[in-house]
């Protein structure tokens, strides 16, 4: 075997061994929410994230772009977080946040100093439990998504390339369209359709909550029960 191949195998094996050393705790809450906890006290920071098992593959062919649209819409606020305040709460507590969508899932996260762990858990419980979905939020985020498409697709060289490839690769499969979807479909959708999509997919039993960083496992579990056991699965 060439020396290069031997070296590659050794390095690859070492990488696998290191990956296996990551310890975590996982369990399910009674409402179906899957929880993953990883303790790493090397720095005073925590990451709180929720992954929903919903992406563009879960959309109807005449209503594409819904999952990506909800990536934006669920930052609009909740019954306990005023419109436009979500990101202000994050930044004012020393954190940052973002979200992204693929064909298979939608992912939200916050990173905070570890003394703001409860803030992160509360924010995600509000997003899941009490989202406010109304006409003004839908209209606002519709314009945001249109601008994103203009910037990243319409006004980029070969911006439509991936979409054209997917159409040809997956002619009879929901991978046929890219997550950003059709602006015409979003324009035609009614408020009731958006509300129904939210109730169907953005629920505890369709989500994974992961928390990693400078945490105390028992205290974190208590916070999980405080903010998530009251959630409904319907």
Residue spans for each PLM region:
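Charge-rich, well-structured scaffold segments of protease-associated domains
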Residues: 28, 85-234
């Amino acid at each position: 075997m060439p020396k290069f191949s031997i070296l590659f195998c050794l390095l690859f094996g070492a990488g696998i061994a290191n990956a296996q050393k990551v310890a975590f705790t996982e369990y399910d809450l009674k409402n179906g929410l899957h929880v993953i906890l990883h303790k790493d006290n090397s720095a005073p920071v925590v990451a709180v994230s929720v992954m929903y098992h919903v992406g563009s593959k879960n959309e109807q062919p005449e209503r594409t772009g819904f999952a990506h649209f909800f990536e934006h819409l669920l930052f609009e606020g909740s019954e306990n977080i005023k419109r436009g305040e979500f990101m202000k709460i994050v930044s004012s507590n020393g954190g940052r946040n973002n979200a992204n969508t693929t064909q298979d899932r939608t992912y939200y996260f916050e990173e905070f100093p570890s003394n703001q762990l409860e803030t992160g858990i509360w924010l995600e419980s509000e997003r899941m439990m009490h989202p406010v979905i109304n006409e003004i939020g839908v209209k606002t985020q519709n314009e945001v998504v249109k601008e994103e498409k203009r910037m990243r697709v319409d006004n980029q060289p070969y911006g439509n390339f991936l979409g054209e490839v997917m159409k040809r690769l997956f002619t009879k499969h929901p991978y046929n369209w890219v997550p950003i979807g059709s602006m015409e479909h979003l324009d035609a959708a009614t408020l009731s359709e958006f509300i129904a999509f939210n109730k169907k997919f953005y629920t505890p039993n369709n989500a994974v909550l992961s928390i990693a960083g400078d945490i105390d496992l028992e205290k974190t579990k208590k916070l999980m029960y405080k903010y998530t056991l009251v959630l409904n699965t319907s």
